[in-house]
Every structure is written in C-alpha cells, then in structure tokens.
C-alpha cells in the first residue's frame, strides 16, 4: 500500500512523513545539479534533472512520498504569461492590469507542461512502489496574486484593490485559472501522480467574503472536476494562513487532506482530524535549531496526534539554510516514535 495514503485507508498506526520543499537548496546534491542550469524555469522543464532532484530526498531520507520538482508558476508560464525568476529576488511577472491582458494568455498550454508530465512518468518508473508520488499546482488565488502583483511576497494591496474594483474581470481571470489548474492536475494524475496537492500560499491575506469567493469556491470547483475523472485520487489542500477560516474551509471544501501551517493549535488539528486527514505542522525554523528542541517540538505534535488521521510535515517548506543532519534526525525520530509507541510510553 502506498505509505502516504495509509491514513486514507483507515491505517493510522503508521505516521506518514514527507516535507514541503524536501527537494531543494538545503541539499548539497540538489545544489550540484541546479548549478548546471542558469534559468530556473528551464531547470523545472528539464526531464532528466527534475527527475533526479525529485528522487534525491527519497534516496537520502526514505520519505513516504516524493513531490514532483516543479513550481506553481509553470502553469501561467505555459499559458503564455511572462514569468521569470531573478536570482536573490524571486519570480518577476508581467502584471495583469486590464481586459486587454487576456490576449497574452493562451486557451491551450504550450509544450512546456508536457515536460512536467514526462517528469512524473519518469519519476514514477524509478520510485520504489510503496512510496507515493505527489503532483501539485498553485491554487487560483495565489497564482492570480502573482499575476496581479507582478512579483511575490508583497503586502497584496495591488491584488486586493484589483478584486474590489474589478469584480467582473477578477472573476473572469479567476475562472480561467481555475479551469486550467484542474486540467493541469488531471493530467498529472493521468501521468502517474498518486496524490495531488493545491498550494494556496497567500490565502491568509483575504477577509472572509473574499476568502469564500477566491479560495473556497475555486478549490471546490477544481476538486469536483478532478474527482469526476479520478474519484480515488487523494487531494491535499493547503490554504496557508487561513486562521479561523480553516474551519469554514473544512466544512465547505470536499478535501481528503488539510495541510495546516504552524500557527494552528495542536488541539484544533486533533479536532479536525475527526473530519479530515490533517497534515502538518512543525515550524520550519525548528529545523534550524538543535536535536533537543527538534525532539521536544516533534514529540508534542506526535503525542497530540497519536492514533489520529495524520501526516507529519512542516507548517511550510524546508528553509534553504536547514542542516541536512537535522532533517535526518527528525525523520528517524518520527520512525522511532512509531516503533516504540504502539502500546507503550516513549
């Protein structure tokens, strides 16, 4: 049985473990491969190299899932939108400002997305059979925010002002991205992805009304469309920073797994795990500390979530400066907890 899917099958004795950004800059073997290609998007579309770095953390740590090496912005890029990655700056995009800008978006994605699907097929062939393969996409609001802001990690005034002042146009853009995101996830499942994930990194900047319109509704549409084709493929949703709106999200979105950030109280995770599988939520900064702190913080999570529908992960991605030995220690500690804590104290 696929290890990451165990909780979905009612097997909650084993705690599946994988990490967001588990293939990335903290790994020396990743850096070595990454240095061979200057342009980040070219690297994402390189079948051989993306396959190699997807498998690196599996070979090193033996996680229960591999997540395909890609980026949430490959979708708008493949749809013709201008996207670039600047070193030490991050993504830079053409800004979407008016109805006229739809002319830069293609109805059908170009060949670039086919590269992503080739990578999934290649990884699938090389991945040990018990390990799940996760495909993913950015959620519509987050992708739309990048397009409206022209860059990432802003205060989102531009995006929010746009959706307040341009309701019809904002809805049109949202619907376009929603449709293409669903298609992208379906194609990933067709290519061999066992599990799918939606990353909504900027959902936490919205008030309740806009959260419902731009996060909950498009996520529901995507999941329902994917499930029409792949009813048994588990879907993880991560509305990062949703706070109190996580509960509204759980009630209204038919997800299999809810990923949560480190700000969510453990007792809430425990409560929610009666309704949905919960994934999270160790603070990534804990991995920058020492073994005693890692052990202490991890133990608290494992104890609260003991016997619950739970996947161990971080509250966000692994930080680039994370020591590899700390990731190894954490992974081994979770495994040891599983072994020793079935019927005894630990």
Swiss-Prot record:
The pathway to which it is assigned is:
Porphyrin-containing compound metabolism; protoporphyrin-IX biosynthesis; coproporphyrinogen-III from 5-aminolevulinate: step 4/4
Please give the superkingdom of this protein's source. Answer: Bacteria
In this chain, the site described as Transition state stabilizer is at: 71
Q: Which residues bind substrate?
A: 21-25, 40, 71, 146, 201, 316
From the UniProt record, which GO molecular function terms apply? Answer: uroporphyrinogen decarboxylase activity
Enumerate the InterPro entries for this protein: UROD/MetE-like_sf, Uroporphyrinogen_deCO2ase_HemE, Uroporphyrinogen_deCOase
Per its record, the protein catalyses:
uroporphyrinogen III + 4 H(+) = coproporphyrinogen III + 4 CO2
What EC number(s) are associated with this protein in UniProt?
4.1.1.37
Q: Can you supply a Gene Ontology BP term from the record? A: protoporphyrinogen IX biosynthetic process
Concerning Gene3D superfamilies, the annotation shows: 3.20.20.210
Tell me the keywords, alphabetical order.
Cytoplasm, Decarboxylase, Lyase, Porphyrin biosynthesis
One Pfam match, by short name? URO-D
What is this enzyme's class at the first EC digit? lyase
User: Where does this polypeptide localize?
Assistant: Cytoplasm
- GO CC terms for this protein? cytosol
Family (UniProt): Belongs to the uroporphyrinogen decarboxylase family.
Q: How does it assemble?
A: Homodimer.
| Functional description taken from the UniProt entry | Catalyzes the decarboxylation of four acetate groups of uroporphyrinogen-III to yield coproporphyrinogen-III.
Q: What is this protein called?
A: Uroporphyrinogen decarboxylase
Record the organism: Rickettsia conorii (strain ATCC VR-613 / Malish 7)
Which taxonomic lineage does the organism of this UniProt entry have? Answer: Bacteria, Pseudomonadati, Pseudomonadota, Alphaproteobacteria, Rickettsiales
């Amino acid at each position: 049985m696929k290890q990451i899917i165990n909780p979905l099958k009612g097997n909650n004795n084993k705690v599946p473990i994988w990490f967001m950004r588990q293939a990335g800059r903290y790994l020396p073997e990743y850096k070595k491969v990454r240095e061979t290609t200057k342009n980040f998007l070219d690297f994402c579309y390189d079948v051989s190299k993306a396959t190699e770095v997807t498998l690196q953390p599996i070979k090193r740590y033996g996680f229960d899932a591999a997540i395909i090496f890609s980026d949430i912005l490959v979708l708008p890029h493949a749809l013709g939108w201008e996207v670039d990655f600047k070193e030490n700056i991050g993504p830079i995009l053409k800004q979407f400002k008016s109805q006229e800008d739809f002319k830069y978006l293609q109805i059908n994605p170009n060949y670039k997305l086919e590269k992503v699907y080739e990578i999934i097929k290649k990884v699938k062939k090389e991945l040990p059979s018990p390990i799940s393969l996760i495909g993913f996409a950015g959620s519509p609001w987050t992708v739309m925010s990048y397009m409206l802001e022209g860059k990432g990690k802003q205060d989102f005034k531009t995006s929010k002002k746009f959706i307040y002042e341009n309701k019809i146009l904002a809805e049109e853009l949202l619907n376009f991205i929603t449709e293409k995101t669903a298609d992208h996830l379906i194609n990933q499942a067709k290519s061999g992805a066992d599990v799918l994930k939606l990353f909504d990194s900027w959902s936490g900047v919205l008030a309740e009304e806009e959260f419902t319109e731009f996060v909950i509704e498009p996520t529901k549409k995507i999941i329902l469309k994917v499930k029409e084709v792949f009813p048994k493929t588990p879907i993880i949703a991560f509305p990062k920073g949703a706070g109190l709106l996580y509960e509204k999200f759980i009630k209204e979105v038919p997800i299999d797994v809810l990923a949560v950030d480190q700000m969510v109280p453990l007792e809430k995770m425990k409560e929610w795990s009666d309704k949905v599988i919960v994934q999270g939520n160790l603070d990534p900064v804990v991995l920058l500390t020492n073994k005693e702190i890692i052990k202490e913080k991890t133990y608290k999570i494992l104890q609260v979530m003991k016997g619950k529908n739970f996947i161990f992960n971080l509250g966000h991605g692994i930080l680039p400066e994370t020591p590899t030995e700390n990731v190894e220690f954490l992974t081994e500690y979770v495994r040891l907890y599983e072994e020793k804590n079935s019927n005894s104290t630990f």
